[in-house]
Amino acid sequence: THCISSAASDVYKRQHLDTPYPDVTFYNNIPSEWIESLFNLKNTINPIHRKVVPSMYQAILKETICACIRIDGQIIATGLGILDRDYIGIYAIHVKEEYRKHGYARQICTGLLKEGMKKGAQNAYLQVVEGNDNARALYRSLGFQQLYTYWFRVQPDENGNFPPEK
């Protein structure tokens, strides 16, 4: 999997954060409902991921800002901000397929950046999977610039098969 790492220095001083975010709900913790919704948005079916990932989220020691958008009571979009010194890392931006291209990801990103700024963040960073052109366009429009590319290597099992990604 190839990923692109992006960062925006002084993103808050730019004019990219003018999107209102009235649909976004924020939490200072990571609710189990949010994690389950994230699995559903990503179509995560791997039982190992479903078992291990919640404990990984719960083990985050840094201050978090968890965001979601609900329609008819169902979470249709997620985002997570993790604060570290004067940075906020943006993670888990996902929107249910039929709700894409309606500005929900922009609302979540803008909300996380502004809420992070209220808590002392002056810079932001994120990572995006290579080939996710829609996300990359959104992040560029928010002032992010590509810094570098990296990839993960996965060892095949004894039969030469690679584990499923989901």
State the predicted function of each range:
Residues 141-166:
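…primarily DNA-binding HTH/wHTH and HhH modules…
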